[in-house]
Regions:
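N-terminal subdomain of nucleotide-sugar transferases
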Residues: 39-101, 449
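Carbohydrate-associated surface elements
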Residues: 83, 217, 238
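A short helix/loop element that forms part of the nucleotide-sugar donor recognition site in Leloir-type
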Residues: 92-98, 244-260
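Membrane-proximal helix-turn-helix segments that form the acceptor-binding/catalytic region
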Residues: 135, 142, 154-157, 161-165, ...
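A charged, aromatic-enriched C-terminal amphipathic alpha-helix characteristic of glycosyltransferases
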Residues: 250, 392, 396, 409-438
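Conserved donor-binding/catalytic core segment of Leloir-type glycosyltransferases
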Residues: 258-277, 283-286, 297
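Nucleotide-sugar-dependent
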Residues: 277, 325-334, 339-360, 365-378
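Nucleotide-activated donor-binding/catalytic signature segment of Leloir-type glycosyltransferases, i.e.
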Residues: 291-297, 305-330
Length: 449
């Protein structure tokens, strides 16, 4: 078949196979060069991919809900998630797909398995069943941009694959960096699986229109994977900052008493007891602080809790408590003299604990048992709100904590530094950055590298 052009000159017959490449080239060029409508005049349709979403209580579920609320102020959001699996009381009957609508937000749950997360094999089955059902469903969901988070740990690869099939831009919001986390946390052994996973992950990073990370330390990790620096953006989780004139929330004396007990000085780790922490350094250091009236209290749960409880059975100044309800967070934060944030060596930039921002907003000092390359250590020392014991030195940790516990003036200075730093990481400002990234990605056309 032949086609004809007419441009005022004598007509010329051109083979069709020569037209098609030209058209495709023009389409590619127009995706980046054509004038666009103002970004904020039209709603954007966002497809968010994450296995967990409330009522699940994982960190990614809570953050996904926060991001969705910010997006839904102006945009239409579809959340493609799995069945709840955290709380047995929230389990739901199996259906292939279940849909809920709330304003501009549609929550579409695929019929993934909901095994308890305590056994790794069953957790992996939850992951795979979610991917098996979510990918084909995503192909038929209208959207302008895909936002992929990191549950399951290979969700970024799933997002890149879906974006490729749908010919849509995609933003990769990395909460924990995999497979680095799995290998560094001894969940996956170095070998063929890790190498294939890493290769696919690097492909997903290159395909992303933007890669959103939680800190400068994580950004450095991503850049080391040969990703274009222009596309890697830091958006911190931040914390809600109460107005200066707002009254302080009432504190629950029972919560405070449960945490403090009879200790003179309380170091508190509140959060997940996962594979990333320098837990043995904490326990060994705490044992040498028993005669100083210093208590180490863990509030929370996680894969390492049973091992830690067993290891601490003979350490009298170490205590484990379950999570408190969400409305008691201010009391939990207030109960401590200083808060622990820990990352073991080798995982700097792989995991970025977002609890730092809530601690800052509460005006509490931080003991960052982490490599100095970590944001919590480097920022904390620069701004004066943290001390940073070596994560491999229990004696050094104990010495710094002992000195801090005997120096009320230093504690006050660090607490004041925390309050001064907190507004720099105000959550609504960070969320606006993420919304802006998604708006721009949606109007830029698909990424074609």
């Amino acid at each position: 078949m032949q086609a004809k052009y007419s441009s005022g000159a004598p007509s010329e017959t051109v083979p069709k196979h020569r037209i098609r490449p030209t058209v495709r080239a023009l389409q590619r060029a127009s995706a980046f060069q054509s004038p666009r409508l103002p970004l904020y005049n039209l709603p954007v349709r966002v497809l968010l991919l994450n296995l967990y979403y409330p009522p699940d209580t994982s960190a990614t579920a809570k953050m996904a809900q926060t991001v969705v609320a910010a997006l839904a102020e102006k945009h239409d959001v579809t959340v493609l998630c799995g069945r709840p699996s955290y709380d047995p009381a929230e389990r739901r009957p199996w259906r292939l797909y279940q849909s809920e609508q709330s304003g501009r937000v549609r929550i579409l749950r695929v019929g993934s398995s909901d095994y308890p997360r305590t056994q790794m094999k069953k957790r992996v089955f939850n992951y795979l069943s979610y991917v098996f059902l979510s990918v084909p469903r995503a192909l038929f969901l209208p959207c302008d941009v895909i936002l992929a988070m990191t549950d399951p740990p290979f969700e970024g690869i799933v997002g890149a694959f879906g974006a490729l099939l749908k010919n849509k831009p995609y933003v990769y919001n990395i909460r924990d960096l995999y497979p680095d986390m799995a290998v560094g946390g001894s969940i996956v052994k170095p070998g063929l699986l890790a190498r294939v996973w890493e290769k696919l992950h690097r492909w997903a990073l290159r395909r992303a229109t933007r890669v959103v990370v939680l800190g400068d330390d994580m950004r450095n990790r991503i850049l080391a994977k040969d990703v274009d620096p222009a596309k890697v953006v830091v958006v911190r989780d931040g914390a809600e900052i109460a107005p200066v004139a707002a009254p302080a929330p009432p504190l629950d004396s029972e919560v405070i008493r449960a945490i403090r007990g009879d200790f003179r000085f309380v170091l508190l780790h509140a959060g997940n007891l996962g594979f990333y922490g320098a837990w043995d350094t904490l326990l060994s250091g705490a044992a040498s602080l028993a005669d100083d009236g210093v208590g180490l209290v863990f509030v929370g749960d996680g894969a390492q809790r049973l091992r830690l409880e067993t290891a601490a059975a003979q350490i009298p100044n170490v205590r484990f408590l379950p999570f408190f309800p969400g409305n008691k967070v201010s009391s939990v934060l207030a109960a401590a003299d200083a808060h622990i944030i820990t990352i073991k060596r080798g995982l700097e930039g792989v995991v970025v604990p977002s609890k730092m921002y809530g601690i800052l907003a509460a005006g509490k000092p931080i003991v960052a048992v982490a490599p100095r390359e970590c944001d919590v250590a480097s920022l904390g020392e620069a701004k004066g709100f943290s001390i940073s014991p070596d994560p491999d030195d229990p004696a050094g940790f104990a010495q710094l904590v002992r000195q801090l516990s005997q120096n009320p003036a230093r504690l006050r200075q660090m607490g004041q530094a925390s309050l001064a730093a907190a507004p720099e990481y105000e959550r609504s400002a960070e969320l606006r950055k993420l919304v802006n990234i998604l708006e721009k990605a949606a109007t830029s056309g698909p990424h074609r590298k």
